[in-house]
Amino acid sequence: MLFDSHLHLDQLSDENIQQTLAHSKIIGMLAVSTNLNSAKKLLNLKQTYPKKLYIAAGFHPEQQLPSLEEQKKLFQWIDEHHSSISAIGEVGLPHYSKRENPNLDYVPYIELLERFILIAKKWDLPLNLHIVHNDVEIALELLQKHNIQRAHFHWFKTDEKSFQKFFSTPYFASLTPDILWNSKTQYVAQHLSLNRLMIETDSPWQHEGFERAGISEQLLAVLQKLAELKSLPLHSVQKQILLNTQQFYRL
């Protein structure tokens, strides 16, 4: 059985959404939101597929910051619907936007991330994070400042120094199909304990070599490569990864 721990389900076509949720090999998925409208759409979908679809509410950091009024509405919506969501996400820092625009002011993004951390703590919800490379240390400092125990770093990749700091925390990381060729993803897979790993597709993102592959095919490819890197039987890796995800998100 397969569980996708991070995807943008609301960005798929209606037909693809139905096919994905009806797939017999997919036992569940954690769908993250990019803004308030995204979260609302996911909640409507969840009401149709309550046993397979779990959702997260947040604001994707690789976009223009929401206005204070938009932030207020999003936080209010989370307060009103916290019992229906399984995580706060996707939230984090705009690493790729900063790469394109070195003058981007990070301060308001850090402040917004801290607000999301506080609301996650308020409702005892885990965080599904967009945090990579040199943003890892910033995020770890915020998480530890607020004594956060459940944080999931999606599509995790960073330098060795930041990885060592991450390694000493209780936090989880998830792997995408780029484990097949990305040395940084392979490093995470090899050095992080199996009981701190999850798998994901970040669908509808198209991974190299998987442009026509469905979600189940992508997840299975990640598991197979992970089993190879860990020198473990595929069935035991698959069982542990599913258990990790269910326990982390309290499903």
Swiss-Prot record:
Q: Which residues are recorded as binding a divalent metal cation 1?
A: H6, H8, E90, D202
Cofactor(s) this protein requires: a divalent metal cation
GO MF terms, alphabetically ordered: hydrolase activity, acting on ester bonds; metal ion binding
Q: Which SUPFAM superfamilies does its entry note?
A: Metallo-dependent hydrolases (SSF51556)
Keyword rRNA processing assigned to the entry: answer is no
Cofactor: record remark: Binds 2 divalent metal cations per subunit.
The EC number(s) given in the record are 3.1.-.-
List the InterPro entries. Answer: DNase_TatD-rel_CS, Metal_Hydrolase, TatD-like
Q: Which Gene3D superfamilies match?
A: Metal-dependent hydrolases
Q: Which UniProt keywords apply?
A: Hydrolase, Metal-binding
Ligand binding (a divalent metal cation 2): E90, H130, H154
Q: Domain of life of the organism in this record?
A: Bacteria
Pfam families to which the protein is assigned, alphabetical? TatD_DNase
Q: What family does the entry list?
A: Belongs to the metallo-dependent hydrolases superfamily. TatD-type hydrolase family.
Protein's UniProt name: Uncharacterized metal-dependent hydrolase HI_1664
The lineage is: Bacteria, Pseudomonadati, Pseudomonadota, Gammaproteobacteria, Pasteurellales
